[in-house]
């Protein structure tokens, strides 16, 4: 009889540890990539896992109704620029949501199409270049493009 109680205590002890799984990852639900979910202002927070260099920035303001964007950036030039254009979203059955765009004034297409993942309700998303999976950008939602950046763009125009 003592052996049965010892055996039951051993099983209870083992089951207590078996039910606790620390390796389980919490998966946050993601939103579908639609013009409505992209609508608003997004700031480039990380590029290839690194924060942006001091003095550089990129803000993208998406307009869901017109399917247009305004990009305020100081990235590839010493002057701030506002670049405008239109965007498209395609749901590829193999890649997921692919975002592409065209610049206004005949300036061509974006350099890459981007696979958009991890669009969180909390306000972040990840873009990976479709043809270069080492080009990864993380964007976070913000209320607006800072006034000083808009002023800097107007001075430089």
Range-by-range predicted roles:
Residues 21-24:
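Bacterial signal peptide processing site
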Residues 39-67, 102-110:
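Short, solvent-exposed loop/hinge segments that bridge or flank secondary-structure elements
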Residues 82-92, 128-157:
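Edge beta-strand at a domain terminus
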Residues 95-118:
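An anionic, turn-rich surface loop/hairpin at beta-sheet edges
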């Amino acid at each position: 009889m003592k052996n049965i109680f010892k055996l039951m205590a051993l099983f209870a002890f083992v089951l207590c540890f078996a039910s606790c799984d620390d390796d389980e990852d919490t998966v946050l639900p993601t939103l579908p990539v639609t013009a409505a979910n992209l609508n608003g202002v997004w700031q480039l927070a990380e590029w290839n896992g690194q924060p942006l260099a001091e003095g550089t920035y990129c803000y993208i303001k998406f307009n869901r109704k017109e399917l247009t964007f305004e990009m305020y950036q100081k990235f590839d030039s010493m002057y701030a620029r506002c670049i405008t254009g239109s965007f498209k979203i395609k749901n590829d059955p193999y890649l997921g949501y692919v975002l592409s765009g065209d610049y206004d004034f005949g300036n061509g297409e974006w350099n890459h199409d981007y696979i958009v993942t991890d669009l969180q309700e909390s306000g972040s998303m990840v873009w990976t270049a479709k043809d270069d999976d080492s080009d990864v950008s993380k964007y976070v939602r913000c209320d607006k493009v800072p006034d000083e950046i808009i002023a800097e763009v107007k001075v430089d125009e």
